[in-house]
């Protein structure tokens, strides 16, 4: 029924032409074929500004270069963090990168973009151009790394208050063309390959990847698996999955999949960059050759090393270790250095070399992050396993209402590249349509299996518990998830909980439609008992896969922001209010987003089981 409704309300897809699309080898010989391509999509910077107050944002009265003589400032706006952050230069390029894999008549194309996100109209523009040459629409999975140092491709990061979108329509067309061309180039470069898969949990990469709450030594107490989770509960997705295809002439591609936000250069930057992802790819390409591609995993809630601590790694891969100075070697209270030669490495009681910590909000931090992921990927591949077929890929549509208050206010003024003129407004397909919900959009989830490797996709930033489940093997979690009195500053998972709420708020439902109740700050609270859905029998998404290796692909086929467990969604917050520990709720398309994703993947799983 859903498919019938969508057929009546969405633009129909073109029918693929007959034959082998794009020259992809669709032969039944048991051989894996792969090709890869990379296209530089760095925009030209013509108009720059003078940042008189050093806040990295254009304040309206600061001088600027009016290159086109229009009398208005028309920069490349950088996406991520706050609006009005112009690009004054390029630190490193941003890319569109593609991998095409085929075996025994089946094929798939995976595309990674160094963008904050890309709406489905541009992705489908590329898709339809490929379909015209025989490419099946369900075989194109396009994702954005969620880069916070790239150009705005959504619209929110220009001047939203002034009604000025942050995207350039010509650049948007360029991105669609780059997606198409990258797939064509990758298909044209396909050769037989041996495929290897590897994985590693970043929490297992040494004591400095975790804080004391999680058995490590990082100065950030709740650092876990190289992630500083900024939203309660502290649940992380720290699996790094790596795929590599090697042909007779050398490496064709190396693909990484991990959850960390490419945002660690922070907002105090006016140079375009692919953030840590670019460093990781450069290291892997120097190590192996070929083309490196990154696809994000469960990005949401908040998977990032930002505000954490990382061991310092230099551009050449040198790990910088702390040393003992003259004062330390003479200090009996300094157990690491007392009695050691001056200049010796600082080694703690467990025999671990103590690192120097990278400066936060710096390119050194970006480099350190990129090297950490690259080195883990290299080790994962060294211990990896071979991959053969079969290959199977499928997708499932769903309808998502846009109930976000700010999007319904800003959308009609043309701020977003995903325009309301493309929305579903027929009440049969979008029953939520009202004065507060101006429409719905069609979205898709994908399922891809290649031998022992399985991927599921979402069109946004998935909170990791929706993918991997809850840490119910930890007694601390069991207690804190059920009992709000166990939460607060001394808690491990729910440490931001306002103790003033414990006695005054009977249950979380009382806070879901308000910002505060008396002295209780509702924006510090999260659902109790904490759960993924109020729908019965809802398991984590990756439980649908029985492959040995499994992971999510986030930001795929469109971008509707955060996917949050519906019982934990605060419906009162918006971009026009305080957000507390519910920032993600202010930019998510809808409180029902997670349940719609869960439902769509359930339908997909049911179909695959038949």
Predicted features and spans:
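C-terminal motif of bacterial Sec signal peptides marking the signal peptidase cleavage site
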Residues: 6-7
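Short, conserved catalytic or interaction motifs in soluble domains
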Residues: 10
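Conserved beta-alpha junction segments in alpha/beta enzyme cores
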Residues: 14-143, 150-375, 381-610
